[in-house]
Amino acid sequence: MESLYSVYNDIAERTKGDIYIGVVGPVRTGKSTFIKKFMETIVVPNIKDPYDKGRAIDETPQSASGRMIMTTEPKFVPNEAVTITMDDNISLNVRLVDCVGFMVKNAIGHMEDEVPRMVKTPWSDYEIPFEEAAAIGTRKVINDHSTIGVMITADGSFTQFTRNDYQEAEENVIRELKATG
Protein backbone atom coordinates (compact mmCIF):
# COMPACT_ATOMS: atom_id res chain seq x y z
CA MET A 1 0.00 0.00 0.00
CA GLU A 2 3.03 2.30 0.35
CA SER A 3 3.10 3.01 -3.41
CA LEU A 4 -0.59 3.94 -3.38
CA TYR A 5 0.03 6.61 -0.76
CA SER A 6 3.01 7.99 -2.68
CA VAL A 7 0.76 8.38 -5.73
CA TYR A 8 -1.67 10.51 -3.70
CA ASN A 9 1.26 12.49 -2.29
CA ASP A 10 2.74 13.02 -5.76
CA ILE A 11 -0.59 14.24 -7.14
CA ALA A 12 -1.13 16.52 -4.13
CA GLU A 13 2.32 18.07 -4.58
CA ARG A 14 2.03 18.56 -8.35
CA THR A 15 -1.46 20.08 -8.21
CA LYS A 16 -1.07 22.00 -4.93
CA GLY A 17 -3.71 19.65 -3.57
CA ASP A 18 -6.40 20.46 -6.15
CA ILE A 19 -7.82 17.30 -7.72
CA TYR A 20 -10.45 17.47 -10.45
CA ILE A 21 -11.82 14.01 -11.17
CA GLY A 22 -13.31 13.95 -14.66
CA VAL A 23 -15.97 11.25 -14.88
CA VAL A 24 -16.32 10.35 -18.55
CA GLY A 25 -17.85 7.66 -20.73
CA PRO A 26 -20.80 7.12 -23.06
CA VAL A 27 -24.22 8.51 -22.18
CA ARG A 28 -26.36 6.36 -19.85
CA THR A 29 -23.50 4.39 -18.26
CA GLY A 30 -23.90 5.65 -14.70
CA LYS A 31 -21.47 8.59 -14.59
CA SER A 32 -23.84 10.72 -12.50
CA THR A 33 -24.62 7.71 -10.28
CA PHE A 34 -20.87 7.25 -9.68
CA ILE A 35 -20.56 10.93 -8.76
CA LYS A 36 -23.59 10.69 -6.47
CA LYS A 37 -22.10 7.69 -4.61
CA PHE A 38 -18.65 9.35 -4.43
CA MET A 39 -20.27 12.47 -2.99
CA GLU A 40 -22.29 10.47 -0.43
CA THR A 41 -19.40 8.31 0.76
CA ILE A 42 -16.30 10.50 0.45
CA VAL A 43 -17.05 14.18 -0.11
CA VAL A 44 -20.13 15.05 1.97
CA PRO A 45 -18.86 13.32 5.17
CA ASN A 46 -15.78 15.60 4.99
CA ILE A 47 -17.82 18.82 4.95
CA LYS A 48 -18.03 20.33 8.43
CA ASP A 49 -20.33 23.32 7.91
CA PRO A 50 -23.99 22.19 7.79
CA TYR A 51 -24.93 24.87 5.22
CA ASP A 52 -22.03 23.90 2.93
CA LYS A 53 -23.00 20.25 3.39
CA GLY A 54 -26.60 20.95 2.40
CA ARG A 55 -25.50 22.94 -0.63
CA ALA A 56 -23.14 20.14 -1.74
CA ILE A 57 -25.97 17.62 -1.46
CA ASP A 58 -28.18 19.90 -3.57
CA GLU A 59 -25.41 20.15 -6.21
CA THR A 60 -25.20 16.37 -6.55
CA PRO A 61 -26.45 15.28 -9.99
CA GLN A 62 -29.71 13.43 -10.49
CA SER A 63 -29.65 9.87 -11.73
CA ALA A 64 -32.39 7.74 -13.26
CA SER A 65 -32.98 4.58 -15.22
CA GLY A 66 -34.10 4.48 -18.83
CA ARG A 67 -32.85 5.59 -22.21
CA MET A 68 -33.35 9.36 -21.71
CA ILE A 69 -30.14 11.40 -21.48
CA MET A 70 -30.17 13.10 -18.07
CA THR A 71 -27.00 15.22 -18.05
CA THR A 72 -27.11 18.14 -20.47
CA GLU A 73 -23.77 19.93 -19.89
CA PRO A 74 -20.49 19.58 -17.99
CA LYS A 75 -20.98 20.24 -14.29
CA PHE A 76 -18.46 20.72 -11.45
CA VAL A 77 -19.57 18.89 -8.31
CA PRO A 78 -19.49 20.23 -5.66
CA ASN A 79 -19.38 23.89 -6.69
CA GLU A 80 -16.52 24.49 -4.22
CA ALA A 81 -13.70 21.97 -3.70
CA VAL A 82 -13.87 19.94 -0.48
CA THR A 83 -10.74 19.01 1.46
CA ILE A 84 -10.36 15.27 1.98
CA THR A 85 -7.60 13.83 4.13
CA MET A 86 -6.23 10.45 3.08
CA ASP A 87 -5.07 7.80 5.55
CA ASP A 88 -1.49 9.07 5.38
CA ASN A 89 -2.50 12.65 6.32
CA ILE A 90 -2.32 13.80 2.70
CA SER A 91 -4.92 16.49 2.05
CA LEU A 92 -6.58 16.88 -1.34
CA ASN A 93 -9.11 19.48 -2.46
CA VAL A 94 -11.56 17.43 -4.52
CA ARG A 95 -14.16 18.29 -7.15
CA LEU A 96 -15.72 15.95 -9.67
CA VAL A 97 -16.57 16.93 -13.23
CA ASP A 98 -19.66 15.34 -14.77
CA CYS A 99 -20.29 15.35 -18.52
CA VAL A 100 -22.93 14.23 -20.99
CA GLY A 101 -20.69 11.68 -22.70
CA PHE A 102 -20.56 10.36 -26.23
CA MET A 103 -23.86 9.27 -27.76
CA VAL A 104 -24.88 5.60 -27.77
CA LYS A 105 -27.27 3.84 -30.09
CA ASN A 106 -30.89 3.92 -28.92
CA ALA A 107 -30.42 6.79 -26.42
CA ILE A 108 -33.17 9.39 -26.46
CA GLY A 109 -33.06 13.11 -25.81
CA HIS A 110 -30.69 14.25 -28.54
CA MET A 111 -33.38 14.26 -31.25
CA GLU A 112 -36.71 16.08 -31.35
CA ASP A 113 -39.38 15.29 -33.93
CA GLU A 114 -36.82 13.17 -35.80
CA VAL A 115 -34.35 16.05 -36.27
CA PRO A 116 -31.26 16.83 -34.19
CA ARG A 117 -32.07 18.82 -31.07
CA MET A 118 -30.27 22.15 -31.36
CA VAL A 119 -28.67 23.81 -28.31
CA LYS A 120 -26.77 26.99 -27.52
CA THR A 121 -23.46 26.44 -25.79
CA PRO A 122 -20.72 28.68 -24.38
CA TRP A 123 -18.42 27.25 -27.09
CA SER A 124 -20.33 28.51 -30.11
CA ASP A 125 -22.08 31.70 -31.23
CA TYR A 126 -24.82 29.69 -32.91
CA GLU A 127 -26.95 26.65 -32.12
CA ILE A 128 -25.34 23.26 -32.67
CA PRO A 129 -26.76 19.73 -32.48
CA PHE A 130 -27.00 18.35 -28.92
CA GLU A 131 -24.85 15.36 -29.93
CA GLU A 132 -22.04 17.67 -31.10
CA ALA A 133 -22.31 19.77 -27.93
CA ALA A 134 -22.13 16.60 -25.81
CA ALA A 135 -18.95 15.52 -27.61
CA ILE A 136 -17.35 18.97 -27.24
CA GLY A 137 -18.21 19.11 -23.53
CA THR A 138 -16.89 15.60 -22.94
CA ARG A 139 -13.62 16.44 -24.71
CA LYS A 140 -13.31 19.59 -22.59
CA VAL A 141 -13.74 17.56 -19.40
CA ILE A 142 -11.05 15.13 -20.59
CA ASN A 143 -8.57 17.70 -21.94
CA ASP A 144 -9.16 20.93 -20.02
CA HIS A 145 -10.82 20.27 -16.67
CA SER A 146 -9.51 16.99 -15.20
CA THR A 147 -6.48 16.10 -13.13
CA ILE A 148 -7.62 12.47 -13.06
CA GLY A 149 -9.96 10.79 -15.53
CA VAL A 150 -12.32 7.99 -14.54
CA MET A 151 -14.03 6.20 -17.41
CA ILE A 152 -17.38 4.60 -16.68
CA THR A 153 -18.47 1.75 -18.95
CA ALA A 154 -21.50 -0.51 -19.06
CA ASP A 155 -22.14 -4.04 -20.24
CA GLY A 156 -25.86 -3.52 -20.73
CA SER A 157 -26.86 -5.66 -17.75
CA PHE A 158 -28.39 -2.78 -15.78
CA THR A 159 -29.68 -0.56 -18.58
CA GLN A 160 -32.06 -0.76 -21.50
CA PHE A 161 -29.10 -0.86 -23.88
CA THR A 162 -27.11 -3.78 -25.23
CA ARG A 163 -23.37 -4.12 -24.85
CA ASN A 164 -23.09 -3.42 -28.57
CA ASP A 165 -24.90 -0.07 -28.15
CA TYR A 166 -22.02 1.21 -25.99
CA GLN A 167 -18.99 0.00 -27.95
CA GLU A 168 -18.50 2.79 -30.49
CA ALA A 169 -18.95 5.51 -27.85
CA GLU A 170 -16.53 3.73 -25.49
CA GLU A 171 -13.94 3.54 -28.26
CA ASN A 172 -14.31 7.30 -28.77
CA VAL A 173 -13.72 7.95 -25.06
CA ILE A 174 -10.70 5.63 -24.97
CA ARG A 175 -9.23 7.36 -28.03
CA GLU A 176 -9.68 10.78 -26.37
CA LEU A 177 -8.13 9.60 -23.10
CA LYS A 178 -5.14 8.02 -24.86
CA ALA A 179 -4.56 11.23 -26.82
CA THR A 180 -3.93 13.09 -23.54
CA GLY A 181 -0.86 10.95 -22.89
For each of these PLM feature ranges, what is it?
Residues M1-E127, N143-H145:
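Conserved G1/Walker A P-loop phosphate-binding module
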Residues T83, D87-N89, D113-G181:
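Conserved C-terminal guanine-recognition region of P-loop GTPase G domains, centered on the G4
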